[in-house]
Amino acid sequence: MKILSIDVGIKNLACCIIETKPDMMFKIEKWEVINLCGEHPTCCFNTKKGICGNKSKYCKNDIYYCRIHSKKSEFLVPTSELLKIKLKRTKISTLLEIAKKYDININGDKSLNKSQITEKIIKYTDEKMLEPVKEQSANNMNLVSIGISLKNELEKYSDIQNVDQIVIENQISPIANRMKSIQGMIAQYFIMKDITNIDFVSSSNKLKEFIGDQKTTYAERKKIGVNITKDILAKNQLNMDWLPFVSKHKKKDDLADSLLQGLWFLRNKKLIKI
């Protein structure tokens, strides 16, 4: 049996494909965390070792720069004194100082009023200054945008028709309305692909075998999940190659949740042993 286990999220949607093997063994086929907000653009600056690739901080004309390489671009790095909102609140004497500092031509025309000087400085910054790259917030994404992104990401799973079972974390919190909607979107996507073996499972299941009824905080459960995952990988010949991947990943907890959820499902069906 091959299953796809999904830990629901917007910025951190964790997916893990697990296939059962002979002798009650299992193998992880695919494992990742998907950002439905879209990946943050990376720095395009060409270094001696190739393209930088670090997280971008600024951009201009669809070219992205990290904080370090922005200083090597032909454009100005944004400063607080040049922010449009701040300029409109600045005294005319200070505006004249800014114009002089950046050699902004105001034609020596003393008849220009504050609004006209401000517009000249803003025009200058629009042409000469880098623009900050804004981080896409999950809270600002509407469900249609999330649905489009979800579809595009799941379409990348070219072998999805070979998956026998979908296991999705059940969203039960009264404050998780958006997550409940996304859970439904995920299920509907697979239903429309004629994959209808879909189970919604409680998030509490994945650690039951390891901690029983022990009372723990959310943070403690996350930490325990990561440690258990690493321990399972280290002791499993078929999957120990995944250990460096997990150890280096920024979202170890979400990776762990998707794996442990899938393993719980397979153990519950008496298809594997750990």
Stretches with model-predicted labels:
Residues M1-I274:
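Phosphate- and other anionic-substrate recognition elements at nucleic-acid/protein interfaces
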